[in-house]
């Protein structure tokens, strides 16, 4: 299978490290022009350095609808197309699992803002561009937490990630008549950023061994494993697939 994105424009949120950086590198290697988006300017600078001139950076908070609209409008004005959107921005916003009675309204909302609202705002902004083209690919990055439960016990994270799956299915039916596919990748636990490194360390040796023992392939995934799944959904090989959720977790 030879996957290429020659001449295509790809927007990737959460591209300052981890999955997003791996995706940026993978798309650039296959001929795409990548617009790497994140709130972390320093991390974006490293992503663009690694990717080279085919990658540009844009600092934006995906939870800010007005900022998202302005950013996408500017990209659309200077690029001929926006072919692919990967909604990768997310995470737990520094939170840890706590009893439900200890969760504030802002704790709950903060996680929904970046994980679910951010995906909605980005899709909302690119949809008119893709409709005019008559073609597009949207790939949402959910989590195994959205399919089962969160390993961290963070209620908002599991709920927001499940919401991304629902959003994927709904948008697939809404946008399908315009030649736009919408699919979802649900990664298992991957040591991909400072937050997941802290979670890994907190498990201790026994917890780490137990986690790997629950995985059929008996290893943790890598950011490249997730990027490769995104490559498939974004490619012509997935042209008749939409509204689907692909678990990339080594077999759970």
Located regions from the model:
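A glycine/serine/threonine-rich, flexible loop-to-helix segment
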Residues: 177, 184, 189-215
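Substrate-binding pocket helix/loop in short-chain dehydrogenase/reductase
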Residues: 96-100, 104-112, 211
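Residue(s) in the substrate-gating loop at a strand-loop-helix junction
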Residues: 143
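Alpha-helical segment proximal to the catalytic Tyr-Lys
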Residues: 128, 147, 173-174, 239
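Short, small/polar-rich loop/turn modules that mediate ligand/substrate recognition or access, typified
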Residues: 176, 181, 241-243
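Active-site helix of classical SDR
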Residues: 123, 160, 168
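C-terminal substrate-recognition "lid" of short-chain dehydrogenase/reductases
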Residues: 120-123, 135, 219-248
């Amino acid at each position: 299978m030879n996957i290429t994105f020659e001449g295509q424009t790809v927007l990737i949120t959460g591209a300052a490290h981890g999955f997003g950086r791996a995706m940026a590198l993978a798309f650039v290697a296959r001929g795409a022009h990548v617009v790497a988006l994140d709130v972390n300017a320093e991390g974006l600078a490293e992503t663009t350095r690694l990717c080279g001139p085919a990658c540009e950076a844009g600092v934006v908070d995906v939870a800010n609808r007005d900022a998202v609209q302005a950013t996408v409008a500017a990209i659309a004005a200077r690029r001929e197309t926006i072919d692919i959107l990967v909604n990768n921005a997310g995470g737990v916003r520094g939170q840890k699992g706590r009893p439900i009675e200890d969760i504030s309204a802002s704790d709950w909302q903060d996680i929904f803002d970046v994980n679910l609202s951010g995906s909605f705002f980005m899709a909302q902004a690119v949809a008119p561009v893709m409709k005019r083209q008559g073609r597009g690919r949207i790939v949402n990055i959910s989590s195994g937490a959205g399919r089962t439960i969160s390993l961290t016990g963070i209620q908002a994270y599991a709920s927001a990630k499940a919401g991304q799956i629902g959003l994927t299915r709904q948008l697939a039916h809404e946008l399908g008549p315009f030649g736009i596919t919408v699919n979802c990748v649900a990664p298992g636990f991957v040591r991909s950023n400072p937050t997941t490194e802290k979670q890994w360390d907190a498990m201790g040796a026994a917890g780490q061994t137990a986690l790997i023992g629950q995985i059929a392939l008996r290893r943790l995934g890598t950011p490249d494993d997730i990027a490769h799944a995104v490559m498939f959904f974004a490619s012509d090989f997935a042209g008749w697939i939409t509204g689907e959720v692909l678990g990339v977790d080594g077999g759970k």
